[in-house]
Amino acid sequence: AALLTASCTPALKVEVANTTPTERDDETVEIAWSEVAALKGVTPDNIVVLNDDNEQIPSQVLFRGGTEPQALIFQTDADPMESKRFKLVAGQRENYPAEAFGRTVPERYDDYAWENNKVAYRLYGPALETSPEKLVTPGIDVWVKCTDKLVIDEWYARGNYHHNYGDGMDCYKVGVTLGSGASLPFAGGKFWMMGHNYATAHTLDNGPIRTSVELTYAPFDVDGTPVTLTKIISLDANQRFNRMDNIYDC
């Protein structure tokens, strides 16, 4: 839980409370930009988050694919029942290292790949349908990593991600399965597979803390009804799990 209060100095005070009996590591704190904007003179280019020792910590302004700021995020640890205090001020943002990244990979049949400092994933794109492999699948592929660095660009450039060169590898075969975390509609007593890989991919935000993408799928048959799918995926630094919103429209 987060509480915002104003102070006499040009700053917003944020109190983050862990009200559970469980230690929380690298939890993402998200504050609506409408609340941040109450700080006079603040912009996405100068917003700074300070911890209780007055040290700047990495933060990211989310745009969610638009041109206007939507939210501010940063990460923190918290012991059970612990509260931590932060300040939001206008200042000089440091050059935070990117720990989350995603992009379309046209050089590999339009894969969409995304990662953080712990793990990488990919979905298969439209060009793969007409490749020699001719693969159509909603499945999500997982790349395991032995490094905290971002690897997508390097592994694709290397041309072989099925061998571990010391920084991890792709050791799973997705095929026509759901892979790691994909979903399908269930109707009329059966699952219904889409007829194509994703049609469009739009990166919404891209680090340093969160990468997110919106993917759309062409209409496919679900028990006699044409259905479209919009999939929104986000991955935060230091986490191994994605958030996925699957929006089916018929």
Task: Place the predicted regions along the sequence by residue.
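Solvent-exposed loop and beta-edge segments used for protein-protein assembly and interaction
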Residues: 21-25, 66-68, 78-80, 106-108, ...
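Solvent-exposed N-terminal domain segments of exported/luminal and surface proteins
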Residues: 87, 92-192
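Alpha-mannosidase-like glycoside hydrolase catalytic domains involved in N-glycan trimming
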Residues: 10-102, 135
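Residues within well-ordered beta-strands of beta-sheet-rich folds
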Residues: 85-87, 214, 243-247
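Extended, loop-rich substrate-binding clefts of extracytoplasmic carbohydrate-active enzymes
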Residues: 153-238
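Bacterial Sec-dependent signal peptides at the C-terminal "C-region" and cleavage site
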Residues: 1-13
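Short, structured patches in soluble enzyme cores that scaffold and shape functional sites
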Residues: 125, 215-219, 248
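Short, well-ordered beta-strand segments enriched in hydrophobic/aromatic residues
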Residues: 12-18, 118, 231, 242-248
